[in-house]
């Protein structure tokens, strides 16, 4: 069997939703035995669509000769990996975009913290180097070497 792409599963899901809508309409307009055969037919179609979806979404180990790749716009189903947290959000009837937004905000806060620490250490490095140059002139060469290696301000560029 050929590898299943995301668009195939998407089409299968749309078909299942369409069958559910048709069943809802048939139940709403149910008139008794004369519409029963139509409702049974629609339920059988839904069963077939669900069976197709189930077949397409079963995990399949990649075969050795299976070198097919999905495109960037339509990846193979087995290549898609979702974080378990997103699955939990959907299971809890929450919008997965909320998880994405919260994750991005958390990463931004972490980046800001790290940037602040980096700037604080750079400032401390420069102050320490300046004080060491003035207190121990014999270590000036070593201080300059360390500053050059760590990207610090040199003595001749400081004001």
Swiss-Prot record:
Cellular-component GO terms for this entry: mediator complex
Positions of region (Disordered): 54-77
One GO BP annotation of this record: regulation of transcription by RNA polymerase II
Entry keyword Cell membrane: no
The keyword DNA-binding is assigned to this record: no
Domain of life: Eukaryota
InterPro entries: Mediator_Med10
Keywords: Activator, Nucleus, Transcription, Transcription regulation
Residues annotated as transmembrane: none
Localization of this protein: Nucleus
GO molecular function: transcription coregulator activity
Family affiliation: Belongs to the Mediator complex subunit 10 family.
Role played: Component of the Mediator complex, a coactivator involved in the regulated transcription of nearly all RNA polymerase II-dependent genes. Mediator functions as a bridge to convey information from gene-specific regulatory proteins to the basal RNA polymerase II transcription machinery. Mediator is recruited to promoters by direct interactions with regulatory proteins and serves as a scaffold for the assembly of a functional preinitiation complex with RNA polymerase II and the general transcription factors.
Subunit-level organization: Component of the Mediator complex.
Protein name per the record: Mediator of RNA polymerase II transcription subunit 10
Gene source species: Aspergillus fumigatus (strain ATCC MYA-4609 / CBS 101355 / FGSC A1100 / Af293) (Neosartorya fumigata)
Lineage: Eukaryota, Fungi, Dikarya, Ascomycota, Pezizomycotina
Gene this protein is translated from: nut2
């Amino acid at each position: 069997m050929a590898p299943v792409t995301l668009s195939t599963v998407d089409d299968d899901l749309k078909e299942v939703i369409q069958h559910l809508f048709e069943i809802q309409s048939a139940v709403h307009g149910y008139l008794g035995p004369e519409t029963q055969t139509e409702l049974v037919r629609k339920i059988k179609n839904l069963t077939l669509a669900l069976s197709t979806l189930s077949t397409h979404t079963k995990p399949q180990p990649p075969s050795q000769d299976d070198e097919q790749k999905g495109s960037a716009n339509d990846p193979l189903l087995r290549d898609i990996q979702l974080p378990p947290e997103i699955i939990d959000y959907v299971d809890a009837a929450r919008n997965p975009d909320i998880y994405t937004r919260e994750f991005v905000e958390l990463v931004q806060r972490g980046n800001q913290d790290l940037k602040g620490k980096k700037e604080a250490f750079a400032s401390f490095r420069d102050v320490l180097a300046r004080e060491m140059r003035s207190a121990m002139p014999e270590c000036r060469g070593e201080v300059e070497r360390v500053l050059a290696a760590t990207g610090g301000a040199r003595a001749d560029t400081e004001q």
